Amino acid sequence: MLKQRTIKSLVKTVGIGLHSGRKVTLTLRPAPADTGIVFTRVDLPEAVEIHAAASAIGDTRLASVLQKDGARVSTVEHLMSACAGLGVDNLYVDVDAEEIPIMDGSAASFVFLLQSAGMEEQPAAKRFIRVKKAVEVRDGDKLARLEPFFGFKLAFTIDFRHPAVDKTGQTFTIDFADTSYVREIARARTFGFAHEVEALREMGLARGGSLDNAIVLDEHRMLNNEELRYGDEFVRHKILDAIGDLYVIGHPLIASYVAHKSGHGMNNQLLRALLADQEAYEFVTFDKVEEAPVAFLPQAQPAFA
């Protein structure tokens, strides 16, 4: 049986909130089988638990934001991406602010945290959502689509028409049957444009944004002294985000994801469109490990992880 996973021990870190600029303490704890990923705002007078779910995503303008009863947890996508990449099904996430710390702008710090805690299999079958027919959402020339595929594959195209971005790869495809999430995706950093950062700061946002946690571009070039971690880091980060956005559905997807200029909002619309069509998906488990897609096999976990 292909089993669910959680972490072996509690781990904790402190980072900066991208928008508040304040110190945020993040604690990751093991969770029982069939719990899912549960975020808890421990700073509130009465702690609020928010289960990761497509229906719990509210604001998607700047990040994926989980909301419940007026409580928010923002910028969950990088941590969710790391959980997907390492095959973590169940996890308690305690946070003492309304946003997950930005760390270095990638998922690498979260991968390190999870790996430091260790992985533990649980006595319950890992549940997948298998896409049975294509589902697509569009907005002008933007699109996001899920298609039937026995595995997990993503293809993303960006089009920013910026000199520093244009000279890098604009399209990236990854099939986790033979590729490592940790090696090929996890270290790709978020990016933004200097004029947008200034506009956000005037609105009281992006106070924690810096060259230490994002690739920042002016009208012509990259402002960071550090070189790109990948030759096509921009589009790889969009895939990192997409993996996290999709994992909010609560289970690994057995599917192919194709996107052109998609973002957090469109990714969430895609999940909602999938769930709205009961003929488009089914829940599956694998009693025999060897019958599962290669990307999710324990012996191949380093390939996805």
Curated annotation (Swiss-Prot):
Pathway: Glycolipid biosynthesis; lipid IV(A) biosynthesis; lipid IV(A) from (3R)-3-hydroxytetradecanoyl-[acyl-carrier-protein] and UDP-N-acetyl-alpha-D-glucosamine: step 2/6. It comes from the Bacteria. One of its GO terms (molecular function) is UDP-3-O-acyl-N-acetylglucosamine deacetylase activity. GO terms for cellular component: membrane. This is UDP-3-O-acyl-N-acetylglucosamine deacetylase. Its EC number is 3.5.1.108. One of its GO terms (biological process) is lipid A biosynthetic process. The gene is lpxC. The active site is at 264 (proton donor). It catalyses: a UDP-3-O-[(3R)-3-hydroxyacyl]-N-acetyl-alpha-D-glucosamine + H2O = a UDP-3-O-[(3R)-3-hydroxyacyl]-alpha-D-glucosamine + acetate. The keyword Signal does not apply. Catalyzes the hydrolysis of UDP-3-O-myristoyl-N-acetylglucosamine to form UDP-3-O-myristoylglucosamine and acetate, the committed step in lipid A biosynthesis. InterPro entries: Ribosomal_Su5_D2-typ_SF, UDP-acyl_GlcNac_deAcase, UDP-acyl_GlcNac_deAcase_C, UDP-acyl_N-AcGlcN_deAcase_N. Keywords: Hydrolase, Lipid A biosynthesis, Lipid biosynthesis, Lipid metabolism, Metal-binding, Zinc. Its cofactor is Zn(2+). Zn(2+) binds at residues 78, 237, 241. Belongs to the LpxC family.
